[in-house]
Amino acid sequence: MGVMWGLISVAIASLAQLSLGFAMMRLPSIAHPLAFISGLGALNAATLALFAGLAGYLVSVFCWHKTLHTLALSKAYALLSLSYVLVWVASMLLPGLQGAFSLKAMLGVLCIMAGVMLIFLPARS
């Protein structure tokens, strides 16, 4: 049950990260606080994405709380790294997120996935 809650948390956190990335690329820079605050006042896709991303993180924390009640931290923490994989792949596939493929990034993703698989392999008896 803990793995399920962990995977749900990772999926929601990944969607939240993508949503926040979408919002930040479209809202005015925080370096210009008045323009940024004004941009938040406008009800548009960027503002909705920002608040959806923040809400997503909140829901993800609830799921993570459930995860840690039933799964060892050493295993649960490994699940978090899957978010990097999901966000990397989605940023390349979804339009407007400016993700770029590189062999170096692909090697990193493969290392993450191999590490998660090693952690979740059953122990020898």
Swiss-Prot record:
**Pathway(s) where this gene product acts:** Bacterial outer membrane biogenesis; lipopolysaccharide biosynthesis
Q: State the compartments where it is located.
A: Cell inner membrane
Q: How does it sit in the membrane?
A: Multi-pass membrane protein
GO biological process terms, semicolon-separated: lipid A biosynthetic process; lipopolysaccharide biosynthetic process
Q: Which residues lie on this side of the membrane: Cytoplasmic?
A: 1-2, 55-76, 122-125
The reply to whether Transmembrane helix figures as a keyword in the UniProt entry is: yes
Query: Where on the tree of life does the source sit, at the highest rank?
Result: Bacteria
Q: Which UniProt keywords apply?
A: Cell inner membrane, Cell membrane, Lipid A biosynthesis, Lipid biosynthesis, Lipid metabolism, Lipopolysaccharide biosynthesis, Membrane, Transmembrane, Transmembrane helix, Transport
Against InterPro entries, the record matches this protein to:
Flippase_ArnF (IPR022832), Small_drug/metabolite_transptr (IPR000390)
Q: Which residues lie on this side of the membrane: Periplasmic?
A: 24-33, 98-100
What is a GO molecular function of this protein? carbohydrate derivative transmembrane transporter activity
Keyword check for Zinc-finger = no
Q: Where are the transmembrane segments?
A: 3-23, 34-54, 77-97, 101-121
> What GO cellular component entries does it have?
plasma membrane
Stored HAMAP family: Flippase_ArnF
State how it assembles.
Heterodimer of ArnE and ArnF.
Q: What does this protein do?
A: Translocates 4-amino-4-deoxy-L-arabinose-phosphoundecaprenol (alpha-L-Ara4N-phosphoundecaprenol) from the cytoplasmic to the periplasmic side of the inner membrane.
| Family named by the database record | Belongs to the ArnF family.
Protein name per Swiss-Prot or TrEMBL:
Probable 4-amino-4-deoxy-L-arabinose-phosphoundecaprenol flippase subunit ArnF
Organism, by scientific name, is Salmonella heidelberg (strain SL476)
Q: Recall the taxonomic lineage recorded for the source organism.
A: Bacteria, Pseudomonadati, Pseudomonadota, Gammaproteobacteria, Enterobacterales
This protein's gene is called arnF
